[in-house]
Amino acid sequence: ELGLPGEKSGFVPTRAWKQEHFGKPWLKGETLLAAIGQGYVLATPLQLAVMTARCVNGGYAVMPKLTRNAIDEGGETANAADFPKIDISARSRQILMHALDEAMNHPRGTAYNSRIMDPGLAAGGKTGTAQVRRITMLERESGVKKNKERPWRERDHSLFVGYAPVDQPRYAVSVVVEHGGGGSKTAAPIARDVLKEVQRVYAPGKLAKREADR
């Protein structure tokens, strides 16, 4: 929690929740939908960034702050190891980080065209495309219009979550472009520019010099 008005909680549905609210049992297909963030799943851009950070930082439940540094109760600068661990195995983290790396740096990855090619600055991440309207079976049979052929309000949202650098993560980012279309076309290039610039400006050597000059 940032302590700002308007914050919203995320939501991951359960079998009990669906039964209580709709009086219907959970379907196997809904598990697959939830796994890719569809169906009843809700998340804000900030929550997506926090999720990414927690998965790649060693499994520590870091919390975002609107300050230059996160300060603990003793007045010391907090780091990831100061936070509790989340319930994710080392094996699961390894698989996830490899997948995020491949999605951005493998030629067949969905974000390959937005990869960072500067030595030592490579990022990992995943594109996302959020459907904003229901597509009927009749539309599917007759042919669904391409995103750019639809009215703006019916176009998909463009998403991307990522982190950098891939070998020693320090930064996490999420980008959501409303009605921006596919994640690889709109959100991923923005995230690439952000991750590249933050690594350039806050390179470890530059950070050490700034702290020494303070």
Q: Model segments located where?
A:
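Short amphipathic alpha-helical face segments that pack within enzyme cores
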Residues: T44-V50, T186-D193
